[in-house]
Amino acid sequence: SRLVSCFGAEQADDQLVANVNAAFGTDIVVQDFTNVMRNVRSRRIDTTKYVDCGTKNNLDLVQWAVSAYNAKWGYVMGTFGQVLTVDLLEAKLQQLPDAIGPYEDFIRANYLGVRTADCIGLIKGYSWYDTDTGEIRYGTNGMPDVGADQMYAQATEKGSMSTMPEIPGILVHAPGHIGIYIGNGYAIEAMGTKYGVVKTAVASRNWTGWCKNPYINYIEETEVEGI
């Protein structure tokens, strides 16, 4: 069909839009198309690479973080992976006016209809996510509503960055902030309102310590070979 012929392998949005406009005489704007597709991609949570949907574990936490990064999740203080609606944003503005108010225009322009999280919300959202229903259910699966510093304080296995083990799914911490180590020297973190969920080199950031998330199981990668 004409529509199918517009698609090509590893095709950029601008080329696809140009092909569709040429085939159908439309006048689709590339940025409008990109924004729509971003919202579609952001809403989907990819669990296809999870090793065990029945437990909350470090390897699936990594996959959760990678999915959030690939989907370009945004950042809104006090959120934990929900799709940002007008009602949710207004509720958060009332709850955290000083933290969110200065960024309200930016958030409305960039994140409505997109999944968002703050730094610790990215971690809590994984534990609260129900893989059967696709819902994020607050306070479930033994994960309390803690802050970044509380998470680090409550961890029983932790240390300075010089002692950090090579374990995907451990957490990296600095006062007031936390991220997810994904391996090979990189972490994924909800960095801030203007940045969203990003992938960063651990050595390039000012992390002060690491810890194991005390509310999930830790699986050695060798234990899941063949799954």
Where are these regions (language model features)?
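Short alpha-helix capping/helix-loop boundary micro-motifs
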Residues: A155-T163
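Short, basic/aromatic beta-hairpin or loop at an interaction surface
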Residues: D132-A153
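Loop/turn positions that initiate beta-strands
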Residues: I167-I170
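Active-site or metal-binding loop neighborhoods of secreted/extracellular toxin and effector enzymes
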Residues: A187-I227
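A conserved glycine-rich beta-strand in the N-terminal activation segment of trypsin-fold
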Residues: I178-I182
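N-terminal capping segments
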Residues: R2-E135, P175-H177, I188-T193, G226
